[in-house]
Design a protein with these regions (language model features):
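C-terminal catalytic region of ATP-dependent kinase domains
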Residues: 175, 180-376
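Hydrophobic residue at the +6 position relative to the catalytic HRD Asp in the kinase catalytic loop
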Residues: 160, 165-167
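Short, low-complexity Ser/Thr-rich regulatory SLiMs
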Residues: 100, 167-169
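Short, glycine/acidic-enriched loop or turn micro-motifs at the edges of active sites
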Residues: 118, 162, 183
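Conserved ATP-binding subdomain of kinase catalytic cores across diverse folds
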Residues: 20-133, 137, 142-157, 313-382, ...
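Short acidic-glycine loop/turn motifs at beta-strand connectors
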Residues: 56, 169-172
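Conserved protein kinase catalytic core
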Residues: 72, 121, 167, 186-188, ...
């Protein structure tokens, strides 16, 4: 336990302070013991970082503690708080700890404490497994999507990289979360130049990080770090263009505007305000998104069923629910009643089929997706086998 001295000061969320006060603040962070099961979940950082539990209970809250300069800690704490208030995908701030002293009275660095993101992993852990080009593409897409969301909020990251990001499984892909906001700041009007600066930093950092893994023999041989980093930029530009640039639509197609809005919904954005301009000859419409909001599918799912999920997990669940409703013989007009039946008859049964000793290792929404994917694979395999057996049975005896 930290020594009771007049200089130690912990500033942060009130409900967390009591747990933090029991941590060994009188020791340099590099001397803190760390649960081996947590070490693998910690990424690399320019600072010393440790993952610790709030209590000895293995199910207790996990904190990430980072030693840094007080000025940087304060700036990052404020940035994370504002990001959280604006609904950005980022870790949440817990406290700033300063006035640390060793038992001999020597000063120790300031520390910032954040809440570790459950079910997340650093990129080095994700890429050290059996990954495919598809996985790399999905990680690049997730990082690009994260950067788009931050820029829509007017946040200049200043150090976009894989190291400063945590990844969670999101159906077939990944969701990316900002984990280090030390260099970031909000702008009243984020300029194109500032966006381009973030993109250049992302291009350089991602290529360098993947090159390190390639030299370490972790990446598969066909992996090109520079090409992978470029894919982040390409995906970012594609999303940003879809969200901000005008689309010219045929005025005589009454479904054109609906399709334009659906194309944005498919990538996870709701169109809350749009500007439509009719050409002078009335032959075309110009569709201009004016206000877009992320998490289109996950917000719909939360409102309908109360489930909190990642965006593309929600998209998969909503598709399953739509199929469920389409098969109902007596279809109730109340969508919320049908949603509760689906939760009871489908979702809870699928998730509940997992053995107790395996529960909790994966988010329920991700587990639901993976079980359905496995069932689809088995059904497809069975169909192919039956088709092969049928073909063999129809062969002439002389074959």
């Amino acid at each position: 336990m930290a020594p009771l001295n007049s200089q130690l000061r912990i500033t942060g969320l009130g409900e967390e302070i009591s747990a933090l006060s029991n941590l060994p603040w009188e020791k340099p962070l590099e001397e803190w013991p760390e649960d081996p099961s947590l070490t693998a979940q910690r990424g690399i950082s320019r600072h010393i970082v440790r993952l610790v539990r709030s209590t000895p209970d293995p199910e207790s809250e996990i904190y990430a503690v980072k030693e840094t300069v007080e000025e940087f800690a304060t700036r990052e704490y404020e940035a994370l708080r504002e990001l959280g208030l604006r609904g950005a995908p980022s870790v949440s701030q817990i406290a700033i700890v300063n006035g640390r002293l060793t038992p001999k009275g020597e000063e120790l660095p300031c520390a910032i404490v954040t809440r570790f993101l459950p079910y997340s992993l650093p990129y080095r852990v994700v890429l050290s497994g059996d990954v495919t080009q598809h996985d790399i593409t999905n990680m690049a897409n997730a990082l690009a999507y994260l950067l788009v969301r931050l820029h829509l909020l007017g946040f200049w990251w200043g150090d976009c990289s894989l190291s400063n990001t945590l990844f969670r499984r999101d159906a077939d892909g990944f969701a990316a979360y900002l984990v280090d906001a030390e260099t970031g700041e909000f702008q009243k009007n984020l300029s194109n130049g500032q966006r381009e600066h973030d993109l250049e930093l992302a291009r350089f950092n991602v290529a360098a990080e993947l090159e390190d893994l390639k030299l370490a023999g972790v990446l598969f041989p066909a992996m090109d770090p520079i090409r992978a980093s470029e894919s982040v930029i390409t995906r970012y530009r594609k999303i940003w263009k879809a969200l901000s640039e005008p689309q010219v639509l045929p005025a005589n197609d009454r479904h054109a505007v609906e399709r334009a809005m659906r194309s944005l919904q498919d990538i996870g954005f709701a169109v809350e305000e749009v500007d439509l301009q009719l050409a002078g000859d009335k032959s075309t419409l110009t569709f201009i998104p004016k206000l877009v909001a992320p998490n289109y599918h996950s917000l719909r799912l939360k409102e309908l069923m109360g489930l909190e999920t990642e965006e593309f997990q929600a998209k998969r669940i909503l598709a399953s629910f739509d199929r469920f409703r389409s098969r109902e013989i007596s279809r109730t007009p109340d969508k919320h009643e049908a949603a509760q039946r689906w939760l009871h008859e489908v979702f809870n049964k699928v998730v509940g089929s997992v053995p107790p000793d395996l529960q909790g290792r994966v988010e329920d929404a991700q587990l639901f997706h993976e079980i359905l994917e496995h069932r689809w694979y088995l059904d497809r395999k069975s169909t192919r086998l039956n088709s092969s057996h049928s073909s063999v049975s129809r062969m002439p005896s002389s074959a």
